[in-house]
Amino acid sequence: MMDSPKKLGYHMPAEYEPHHGTLMIWPTRPGSWPFQGKAAKRAFTQIIETIAEGERVYLLVEQAYLSEAQSYLGDKVVYLDIPTNDAWARDTGPTILVNDKGKKLAVDWAFNAWGGTYDGLYQDYEEDDQVASRFAEALERPVYDAKPFVLEGGAIHSDGQGTILVTESCLLSPGRNPNLTKEEIENTLLESLGAEKVIWLPYGIYQDETNEHVDNVVAFVGPAEVVLAWTDDENDPQYAMSKADLELLEQETDAKGCHFTIHKLPIPAVRQVVTEEDLPGYIYEEGEEERYAGERLAASYVNFYIANKAVLVPQFEDVNDQVALDILSKCFPDRKVVGIPARDILLGGGNIHCITQQIPE
């Protein structure tokens, strides 16, 4: 049994620190990506091309889809033939830590499709549960086996200086680690991520089927500086959730004792929902969560990804699209802030941050 990453001197860098590259997975699951994923593949391509301007992109794609992926992307990415059950690289990929000497360590969490038999979204997740270790092996990185502790990358944010953000709704959900107390979960995070403090936000985004991942509601944009998904509509269930998160953040400090600067990032003004036209496009496996017309999707501009040269921000053909771009442009003056039409990723159940996983420099 190897010592914990914390004891070995490793920590999780912030996403805005320099990257070696980004991990992504080609979207092919018929129950996630409607109509053969055609629209999703166009969106993924735009994201990959934008990220690739400033860093390497590793794309997991099985042999059967390789020529298709190459027809979209050519030689812009490093293709790896690693099997997956879906395309959520944030949640199935490794969390890569660094130490003071620049050495890297890949943390391999247990993955059970956001809740296993309790409330998981699909039951065939064996390949997904192996993605982190197989990808680390391909990169020739050592692996810290955190199993059987269940965690997804979208459930944690790090400031790179000892602070981890999580949501109670996700980490304390009965489908993750029901046998562990909150204190035990926190201790596992501190030891596995080389951190000093965990901040527990009460909620994420309303109707987020990951049990409300933190990466959809709050994100670090710098040390002691965050953006928070927000609405002023008191009739929207999101209002009370964001308000509770705001109140907690206002009284909290980071691991260094600093109070947070909090930027409110509006959610889209018009609710994003599944339409009747979307439904025929999905083909489900047994035991897979099914979409319904009128289902509210967890749309949030906070699900952006910070690449070396760009910040990629979801866009929903909404009046708040530009508002979000303007706020984030002020937060990231040294990067190009790029809006990406993202409804076709949202239809899969996540957004830009959910399909990317940074590999620190």
From Swiss-Prot:
Q: Which UniProt keywords apply?
A: Hydrolase
Q: Which domain of life is it from?
A: Bacteria
Keyword field contains Hydrolase: yes
The record's GO molecular-function terms, alphabetically, read:
agmatine deiminase activity; protein-arginine deiminase activity
E.C. number, please?
Answer: 3.5.3.12
Provide the reaction this enzyme catalyses: agmatine + H2O = N-carbamoylputrescine + NH4(+)
Question: Gene3D superfamilies under this entry?
Answer: L-arginine/glycine Amidinotransferase, Chain A (3.75.10.10)
NCBIfam families per UniProt: agmatine_aguA (TIGR03380), PRK13551.1 (NF010070)
* Protein's name in the database: Putative agmatine deiminase
Instruction: List the source organism.
Output: Streptococcus pneumoniae (strain CGSP14)
Q: What is the lineage of its organism?
A: Bacteria, Bacillati, Bacillota, Bacilli, Lactobacillales
Q: Which gene encodes it?
A: aguA
